[in-house]
From Swiss-Prot:
GO terms for molecular function: calcium channel regulator activity; ion channel inhibitor activity; sodium channel regulator activity; toxin activity. Disulfide bonds join 48-63, 55-69, 62-76. Keywords: Amidation, Calcium channel impairing toxin, Disulfide bond, Ion channel impairing toxin, Knottin, Neurotoxin, Secreted, Signal, Toxin, Voltage-gated calcium channel impairing toxin, Voltage-gated sodium channel impairing toxin. It is found in: Secreted. The modification Phenylalanine amide is found at residue 80. Belongs to the neurotoxin 10 (Hwtx-1) family. 08 (Gtx1-15) subfamily. It comes from the Eukaryota. Its main location: secreted. It comes from Grammostola rosea. Residues 22-46 form a propeptide. The primary structure of the mature peptide is identical to that of GpTx-1 from Grammostola porteri (AC P0DL72) and Gtx1-15 from Paraphysa scrofa (AC P0DL73). Potent voltage-gated sodium channel blocker. Potently inhibits the voltage-gated sodium channels Nav1.7/SCN9A (IC(50)=0.58-10 nM). Shows a moderate activity on Nav1.1/SCN1A (IC(50)=6 nM), Nav1.2/SCN2A (IC(50)=5-128 nM), Nav1.3/SCN3A (IC(50)=20.3-170 nM), and Nav1.6/SCN8A (IC(50)=17-20.1 nM). Shows an unclear inhibition of Nav1.4/SCN4A (IC(50)=200 nM to >10 uM), Nav1.5/SCN5A (IC(50)=140 nM to >10 uM) and Nav1.8/SCN10A (IC(50)=68-12200 nM). Weakly blocks the low voltage-gated calcium channels Cav3.1/CACNA1G (30% inhibition of the peak current by 9.8 nM of the toxin). This is Toxin GTx1-15. GO terms for cellular component: extracellular region.
Amino acid sequence: MKTSVVFVIAGLALLSVACYASELKEQSSINEVLSTIFHFEQPEERDCLGFMRKCIPDNDKCCRPNLVCSRTHKWCKYVFGK
């Protein structure tokens, strides 16, 4: 009787370990799928400047639409009709 109880407890422990390992594997695959779905591309290393930000005219980094680096004021300004 004692040995059968020990075998039942050992079997339950083994089943618990197997289920836990299976769940960990499933969780890692779910995390992998989610990270693939929600993977965002890294922004370019361009350092885009916004409106009225200090800039260098020879190295125009005012990259939003209709923004250019002003040669006189040396900041990004809007140019209409560009």
